[in-house]
Structure formats: C-alpha cells, structure tokens
Amino acid sequence: MGINTRELFLNFTIVLITVILMWLLVRSYQY
C-alpha cells in the first residue's frame, strides 16, 4: 500500500512539474 501511494505521489509530482514548465514556456513565448 505504501509503495503504491509513493509511486502515485511521484507520478503526480512529475506531471505537476511538467505542466508548470509547459506553462512557463507558453507564457514566455507569448510575451
């Protein structure tokens, strides 16, 4: 159970970082 929760949290963090990076790229591209 702990390992699955840890993997889920890891995946969520990776997705969050990717979304933030993409948002920053789009924002800097627009300006």
Swiss-Prot record:
GO molecular function, one term: enzyme inhibitor activity
GO cellular component annotations of the record: membrane; sarcoplasmic reticulum; sarcoplasmic reticulum membrane
Record-level GO BP terms: calcium ion transport; negative regulation of ATPase-coupled calcium transmembrane transporter activity; negative regulation of calcium ion import; negative regulation of calcium ion import into sarcoplasmic reticulum; negative regulation of protein-containing complex disassembly; positive regulation of cold-induced thermogenesis; positive regulation of protein depolymerization; regulation of ATPase-coupled calcium transmembrane transporter activity
All ranges on the Lumenal side of the membrane: 27-31
Cytoplasmic side: 1-7
Topology of the protein relative to the lipid bilayer: Single-pass membrane protein
Keywords from the UniProt entry: Endoplasmic reticulum, Membrane, Sarcoplasmic reticulum, Transmembrane, Transmembrane helix
Localization, UniProt: Sarcoplasmic reticulum membrane; Endoplasmic reticulum membrane
Keyword Protein transport recorded: no
Residue intervals passing through the bilayer: 8-26
CDD domains cross-referenced by the UniProt entry: Sarcolipin
InterPro entries linked: Sarcolipin (IPR008028)
Chain segments annotated as coiled-coil in the UniProt record: none
Family statement drawn from the similarity comment of this UniProt entry: Belongs to the sarcolipin family.
Subunit structure: Homooligomer. Can also form heterooligomers with other sarcoplasmic/endoplasmic reticulum calcium ATPase (SERCA) regulators ARLN, ERLN, PLN and STRIT1/DWORF. Monomer. Interacts with calcium ATPase ATP2A1/SERCA1. Interacts as a monomer with ATP2A2/SERCA2; the interaction decreases ATP2A2 Ca(2+) affinity. Interacts with VMP1; VMP1 competes with PLN and SLN to prevent them from forming an inhibitory complex with ATP2A2.
Function, as annotated: Reversibly inhibits the activity of ATP2A1/SERCA1 and ATP2A2/SERCA2 in sarcoplasmic reticulum by decreasing the apparent affinity of the ATPase for Ca(2+). Also inhibits the activity of ATP2A3/SERCA3. Modulates calcium re-uptake during muscle relaxation and plays an important role in calcium homeostasis in muscle. Required for muscle-based, non-shivering thermogenesis.
Protein name per Swiss-Prot or TrEMBL: Sarcolipin
